[in-house]
Amino acid sequence: MIGIFVVLPVVGLSRLDTFALPEVLRYAGLVLLPAGAALSYTSFWFFIRHGRGTAFPTDPPRELVVRGPYLYVRNPMYIGNLAIIFGAALCFRSAAVLVYAVAMCVVTHLYVTLSEEPVLDRRYRDSYARYVSTTRRWLPRWSHGSAIARAERSGRPI
């Protein structure tokens, strides 16, 4: 999936144009690329290991995954993929890839809120409702600790 929605468009679009960019931002892109890949692959591994499934619709996790990166944010795999695209836009100084990255943010948000979250709500019911109440969709709540720690402090297991 990463190849279809991340690598192929980035490689193709990166050759269309370039824009002026301070060198420091190109280096930021060099950090975002591997960081995004690491987050994406780690998130996928947690789906396999702790969810006993994958990110593919044909083999979804059998258990709600609330460990690893999912302690801090509900969609770390998507965040990792988007970081790869933004990193590539900065590295290649590509306006087309930057526009693609912004478009993918919008598409991903709409997909998650309109399609994925209702399915997760039906599949995991109360566990998912508790998880949603303690863990943000896109931005981690660093100052308050993890979803698990907050739930344990309140006496509510996830």
Language-model-detected regions and their locations in the chain:
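Extended, alpha-helix-rich binding/interface surfaces that flank or overlap catalytic cores
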Residues: 75
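Solvent-exposed interhelical
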Residues: 70
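Membrane-anchoring alpha-helices and their flanking helix-loop junctions
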Residues: 1-67, 79-158
